[in-house]
Amino acid sequence: MNVIQTIDAEQIGKLAEARAVPDFKPGDNLRVSVRVTEGERTRIQAFEGVCIARSNRGINSNFTVRKISYGEGVERVFPLYSPNVTEIAVTRRGVVRRAKLYYLRGRRGKSARIAEAARETNAD
């Protein structure tokens, strides 16, 4: 590994200790809690929607979440290892066959739904 990759690995290790990053894929419903500063006040804001893309680039990894708010589509890109992202929770697992779900942008209503993954059971 070169120097930059070593530094990236160290930083990812430090950030992973502070906050657990769940295993999620495009198609999953996520609730992302973000620290928002307005003036001198700081609060936690939740953004819940479908993960439509994930880019794995080491410390620069990010993911895109899409939701429909008051009839308008809203997308937000979150850096995976940002200190402003306080929590990422998977609320529902989806089954898709694509890595990027940009086709959901052109769909409305029932055609924009994603099938839910079957629950995994540990049968002994």
Swiss-Prot record:
One Pfam family it belongs to: Ribosomal_L19
Stored InterPro entries: Ribosomal_bL19, Ribosomal_bL19_CS, Ribosomal_bL19_sf, Translation_prot_SH3-like_sf
GO CC entries: cytosolic large ribosomal subunit
Coiled-coil positions: none
PROSITE patterns assigned to the protein according to its UniProt record, in alphabetical order: RIBOSOMAL_L19
A single MF term (Gene Ontology): structural constituent of ribosome
Ribosomal protein keyword on record: yes
Keywords of the record: Ribonucleoprotein, Ribosomal protein
Gene Ontology annotations of biological process type: translation
Gene3D superfamilies named among the record's database cross-references: 2.30.30.790
Family the UniProt entry places it in: Belongs to the bacterial ribosomal protein bL19 family.
Main function: This protein is located at the 30S-50S ribosomal subunit interface and may play a role in the structure and function of the aminoacyl-tRNA binding site.
Protein name (database record): Large ribosomal subunit protein bL19
Species of provenance: Acidiphilium cryptum (strain JF-5)
